[in-house]
């Protein structure tokens, strides 16, 4: 696995773990301190963070099936989406705890994070699988080599038995 892909997998692990921490924080600490609407907003941020953390892990581990350039762009967009979308939702949900100002402008950047998510998925949908033929050829070659080894092994076993 290339260093770049390992970095995405580790980022996915980190974001997944962080979403569990935020989930515990929300259900044990925030639940009694913010209203239900704010708590729901916080939970949406957690959900999207976890979905995209898992996507980072899965795509990073299966990087050979995808176009390198498009995969890197998509994964970076997912990370940006988590930071902008989920981050702004966390901020908006908890702002009542630490300020009386509205910070309504933060709500205006949330859709930018959503567009990052959508863009990442569209890039993967329309162009992500350009390495599929290469992957299929490599898989076929591995299977052929494995079959040849089995055949040679059977042949040498038969010669030993004779």
Describe every region a protein language model picked out.
Residues 1-162:
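Polytopic transmembrane helical bundles with strong interfacial aromatic enrichment
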